[in-house]
Amino acid sequence: MQLKFLGKDSKPGESPTLYATDRASYVVQGWIVTDPDILATITLADHETLVEVPAKLMIHLAKDDLSGEVTNLAPPIVHVTAEGNYIVRGVRITDAEALGQMDIPDHETCVEVSKPAVAALLIGG
């Protein structure tokens, strides 16, 4: 899987990042979700996981000709935190080629979500 960097929301010690892939999907890199209340409410398949990212990370979708405001909070966004961050559910990235293109700190992981699913979240693009 080849990745195209779209953008990140960087603060010291934090690096949520958004990538487009060569297979009509996005890779969302974010914080590992550890909140037991959130984990208790979301059912995951064995190949899925969750990441938490700032909502403003999604502005970088415009760099892949997908713009608009996220107004439809539906999968792959499965929860919004009290801080306004998105909890994103997707396929856990295990592809060695993709992982080799990213710098992922120990407190983060990444998921793949389909482009059509992300496009369905937007209005006004």
Task: Give residue spans per PLM region.
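Pocket-edge structural micro-motifs
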Residues: G7-K8, Q29-G30, R89-G90
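Short, ordered beta-strand-loop transition motifs
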Residues: K11, A20-D22, V78-G84, P105
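Acidic, aromatic-enriched beta-alpha/helix-loop junctions
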Residues: S25-P76, A96-A120
